[in-house]
């Protein structure tokens, strides 16, 4: 064994206790002292090392998606999509790719109950032959905002009050009263699907718009959808209180126990695609992350299935240290000009470097399974064994060359630089359509959740008037019922 290439793991455990450097430890129960009752000696290196390691076990918590659980499995192509993309892992039916998935809540801290009303993260890392592909989404198909400039403020509004350290509805109501594009997302969050039964019984969505490119270089805008084969199930508010009071990690436990018992969760992957020549034919902007693409106009197309059949071996290594980023893609799956996606491309990688260090992609759970080569050297916690003499490019001493170019069609950009909003905001139509799709009992529960939010003592009459105006523009009947329950007169 080459000791310079050896990576410590549980597979190399010795039969006796050692220090981190491998020295034998003959007593792991007592500190080194002067006699039986004397002071502890600083020279007890094993004690110092043990305490220092313990003091540094925790790493910075994720700003969002702190509470989560991961599982491993595979993705298998079931339908031919080669006419849409030449991505290698989608090349033909039957092709399988290893994956790891992390499910999560979004706003709340690492130890919070998994029964809180909150979006759920649904992030998939594909270990393909052309590098990793991170499809980083949620269990809801839309988002609160369409421009990443607002993201830090939005998260601050959802997070606890910096003075009281309490999450308070008045802050959420106040912030989003300035952002009517959030209404569609709230028809999901304040709907029954706002609290999934567990991770196995929820959908997943790529949320953002991406671009697929085929061998001829023709692009299509695309959205990704995960559908659970066991169906979608949710918890009502009173059920969530009961479940959360019994086990605050119920979703993590359910996922782990199901896989351990051989009841492997499975999702079908579907896509929706739009030809770039048709993107102006709708009453919404296909790059607007606050909108869904109507399935009666843009039907779902089956692609494959994902099965999770293995639990993680170590929660910290494969759940806390796993890092996702929408920028991590593969040839023939490209970004679109979706404003939120464009900002996520930077922000996700940046937060991982803060949380895990500049070499976070070397961690086994994040590293590609395929061969890879570059001149990204050194930095904190770089544990890659390298012995080459040439660390620049190009060189006649290094045979590495440029990869084959992916056929990404050029786009001519000629407009003026400006900070602006999109033209087709259309903030109310889809929110109203979704509300009207609810049965009466479901509508009533939706209204009651808004009544609860708008009756917070810090919510002002102006706030209530604005929200009633918004919901009235979504649905006239909703605009009448909400003020009636609030004992207010509707503004329109």
From Swiss-Prot:
Example of a GO cellular component annotation carried by this entry: cytoplasm
Protein name: Catalase isozyme 1
Expressed in which tissues: Scutella, milky endosperm of immature kernels, leaves and epicotyls.
Keywords noted in UniProt: Heme, Hydrogen peroxide, Iron, Metal-binding, Oxidoreductase, Peroxidase, Peroxisome
Binding residues for heme: 348
Active site residues of this protein: 65, 138
Taxonomic placement: Eukaryota, Viridiplantae, Streptophyta, Embryophyta, Tracheophyta
Function as written in the Swiss-Prot or TrEMBL entry: Occurs in almost all aerobically respiring organisms and serves to protect cells from the toxic effects of hydrogen peroxide.
Cofactor(s) for this UniProt protein: heme
GO biological process, one term: response to xenobiotic stimulus
Subunit structure: Homotetramer.
Cystines in this chain: none
A single GO molecular function term of this UniProt record: catalase activity
Reported effect, residue 483 to A: In strain: cv. W64A
């Amino acid at each position: 064994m080459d000791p310079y290439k050896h990576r410590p793991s549980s597979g190399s455990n010795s039969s006796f206790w050692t220090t981190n450097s491998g020295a034998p430890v003959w007593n792991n129960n007592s500190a080194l002292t002067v006699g039986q009752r004397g002071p502890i000696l600083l020279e007890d290196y094993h004690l110092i090392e043990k305490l220092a390691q313990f003091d540094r076990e925790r790493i910075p918590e994720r700003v969002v998606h702190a509470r989560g659980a991961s599982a491993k499995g595979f993705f298998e192509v079931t339908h031919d999509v080669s006419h849409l993309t030449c991505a290698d892992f989608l090349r033909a039916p039957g092709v399988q790719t290893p994956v790891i998935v992390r499910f999560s809540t979004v706003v709340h801290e690492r130890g919070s109950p998994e029964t809180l009303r909150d979006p759920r993260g649904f992030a998939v890392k594909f270990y393909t032959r052309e590098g990793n592909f991170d499809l980083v989404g949620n269990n809801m198909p839309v988002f609160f905002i369409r421009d990443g400039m607002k993201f830090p403020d939005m998260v601050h509004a959802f997070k606890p009050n910096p003075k009281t350290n309490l999450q308070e509805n008045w802050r959420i109501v106040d912030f989003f009263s300035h952002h009517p594009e959030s209404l569609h997302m709230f028809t999901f969050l304040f709907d029954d699907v706002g609290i999934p039964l567990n991770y196995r019984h929820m959908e997943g969505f790529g949320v953002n718009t991406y671009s697929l490119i085929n061998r001829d270089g023709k692009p299509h805008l695309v959205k990704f959808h995960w559908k659970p084969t066991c169906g979608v199930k949710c918890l009502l508010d009173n059920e969530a209180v009961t479940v959360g009071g019994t086990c605050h990690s119920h979703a993590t436990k359910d996922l782990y126990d199901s896989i351990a018992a051989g009841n492997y969760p499975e999702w079908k992957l579907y896509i929706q695609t739009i030809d770039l020549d048709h993107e102006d034919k709708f009453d919404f902007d296909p790059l607007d992350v606050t909108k869904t693409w109507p399935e009666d106009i843009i039907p779902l197309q089956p692609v494959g299935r994902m099965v999770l059949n293995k639990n993680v071996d170590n929660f910290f290594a494969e759940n806390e240290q796993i890092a996702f980023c929408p920028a991590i893609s593969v040839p023939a799956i490209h970004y679109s000009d979706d404003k939120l996606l464009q900002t996520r491309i930077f922000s996700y990688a940046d937060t991982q470097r803060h949380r895990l260090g500049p070499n976070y992609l070397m961690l086994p759970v994040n590293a590609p399974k395929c061969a890879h080569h570059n001149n990204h050297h050194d930095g904190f916690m770089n544990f890659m064994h390298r012995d080459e003499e040439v660390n620049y490019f190009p060189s006649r001493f290094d045979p590495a060359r440029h990869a084959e170019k992916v056929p990404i069609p050029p786009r001519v950009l000629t407009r003026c630089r400006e900070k602006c909003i999109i033209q087709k905001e259309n903030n109310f139509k889809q929110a109203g359509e979704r509300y009207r799709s609810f049965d009466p009992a479901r509508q009533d529960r939706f209204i009651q959740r808004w009544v609860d939010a708008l009756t917070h003592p810090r919510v002002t009459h102006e706030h209530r008037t604005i929200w009633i105006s918004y919901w009235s523009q979504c649905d006239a009947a909703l605009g009448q019922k909400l003020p009636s329950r609030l004992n207010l007169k509707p503004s329109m």
